[in-house]
Design a protein with these regions (language model features):
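Amphipathic alpha-helical packing segments from all-alpha helical-bundle domains
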Residues: 119-158, 177-188
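Hydrophobic alpha-helical connector segments
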Residues: 79-106, 142-146, 152, 156, ...
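Alpha-helical DNA-contacting segments of helix-turn-helix folds
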Residues: 61-70, 124, 128, 132
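Amphipathic C-terminal alpha-helical segment
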Residues: 110, 138, 157-174, 187-199
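N-terminal intrinsically disordered/low-complexity leader segments
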Residues: 1-15, 194-203
Length: 203
């Protein structure tokens, strides 16, 4: 759906930029990067190319900002509640993450599948995984986690992305079932690594 030029002109600068980033995310995750140009993007959004260049100096800068905005939205949506026990923190973050995936299924699928060929996407996903792993380890361990725990958590994050891709493709299990499956696999991986956290102490 295109947004008309007048509606953009009525917006303040921050709101206009936010909407441009949202539309940019839709376009960059639904089409190959090389197929898009600033002219095509401006036409799809429904604004002039000059206005688009007013906010972003070029396609690469626009692309990178849309990725950064997506990562920030993910961080905010999945921020755990530190007042909850560790397992409840993980459940809450997983619920928020799966809701975001469900709401943006096509974009998520395209983002994951584009990672192999687009360095910026690959780097962003790696950054998000590292930050998520750190969150999980800080929630589960009161002291420096053992190396096996770090390895298990990082491996689990790759599993989670694969499971989410399968879920949005088939939609044959409930979101809560997937959340519990992911949580069970994480705990199982830590147990298998002989690095199961003391949840009573962590809480």
């Amino acid at each position: 759906m295109r947004v008309s030029s007048p509606s953009y002109r009525r917006l303040d600068i921050d709101e206009r930029r936010r909407q441009l980033l949202e539309r940019g995310a839709e376009l960059f995750t639904s089409r190959p990067y090389d197929e898009l140009s600033m002219s095509k993007i401006a036409t799809e959004i429904g604004i002039s190319k000059a206005l688009l260049y007013h906010y972003f100096p070029g396609k690469q800068a626009y692309f990178e900002e849309t990725l950064s905005a997506w990562a920030e939205q993910l961080r905010e949506r999945t921020e755990p509640n530190p007042n909850l026990p560790p397992i409840e923190q993980l459940k809450g973050s997983l619920d928020a993450f799966l809701a975001l995936v469900s709401e943006n299924a096509i974009a998520y699928k395209n983002l994951m599948r584009s990672a192999a060929g687009v360095a910026e996407i690959r780097e962003l996903i790696e950054e998000v995984r590292l930050r998520t792993a750190q969150r999980i380890l800080e929630a589960l361990y009161t002291q420096e986690p053992p190396p096996k725990a770090r390895t298990a958590v990082n491996g689990w994050l790759w599993f989670m992305d694969g499971a989410c891709l399968n879920w949005i493709e088939h939609r044959d299990i409930e979101r809560e079932e997937l959340r519990d499956l992911l949580l069970g696999v994480l705990m199982g991986a830590l147990l298998a690594a002989d690095a199961a956290p003391d949840l009573a102490q962590a809480s």
